[in-house]
Amino acid sequence: MRSGIHPDYHEITVIMTDGTEYKTRSCYGEPGATLRLDVDPKSHPAWTGVQRMMDTGGQVAKFNKRFAGIGTRTK
């Protein structure tokens, strides 16, 4: 490999939603950084089969408010 063109690849700690931790190598952050997951295979609907709507911080309401007038144009 050519030197100086590749990102730093180092060990980080990943914390799953249930608190379990594991070490992996990544370009994320700095050496020894911690990556805390909001959604992982143990809690994601695609892998658990449980369908749930997650509206974090009212994002759907904010979208609806912002674009409420679009498409209601009269001639």
From Swiss-Prot:
Part of the 50S ribosomal subunit. GO terms for biological process: translation. PANTHER family: 50S RIBOSOMAL PROTEIN L31, CHLOROPLASTIC, LARGE RIBOSOMAL SUBUNIT PROTEIN BL31A. It comes from the Bacteria. This is Large ribosomal subunit protein bL31. The keyword Manganese does not apply. Binds the 23S rRNA. GO terms for cellular component: ribonucleoprotein complex; ribosome. InterPro entries: Ribosomal_bL28/bL31-like_sf, Ribosomal_bL31, Ribosomal_bL31_A, Ribosomal_bL31_sf. One of its GO terms (molecular function) is rRNA binding. Belongs to the bacterial ribosomal protein bL31 family. Type A subfamily. It comes from Gluconobacter oxydans (strain 621H) (Gluconobacter suboxydans). Keywords: Ribonucleoprotein, Ribosomal protein, RNA-binding, rRNA-binding. The keyword Zinc-finger does not apply. It holds the Pfam family Ribosomal_L31.
